[in-house]
Amino acid sequence: MQLDFEIEPTINKEYLLEHYTEETYMSYYTGLPIKKGLFLSPLREDHKPSVAFYRTPNGNLIYKDFGDGTHVSFIGFVMKKYMVRYYQALQIIAEDFG
């Protein structure tokens, strides 16, 4: 008896970070450079720069929009941008980065 199937890797945050950095993912989806300063929000109409990036005490990169209170990681940003749940966001990222 022969089984014909492929085992796909488990997609989680750790798996994604084995391949690219948080900065790479965040910059790709926000369309913004990851540096100090304020930027216009890519998620809503914004006439005054209100978005910044910062690192948490444990080193995670965070997107912070002072205009609407959004405070998310790169996965959270994808969830908000595409209006999907966590696992769907992981799948989108994995597919985009092949």
What is each stretch, according to the model?
Residues 1-98:
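N-terminal structured subdomain of primase-like DNA metabolism proteins
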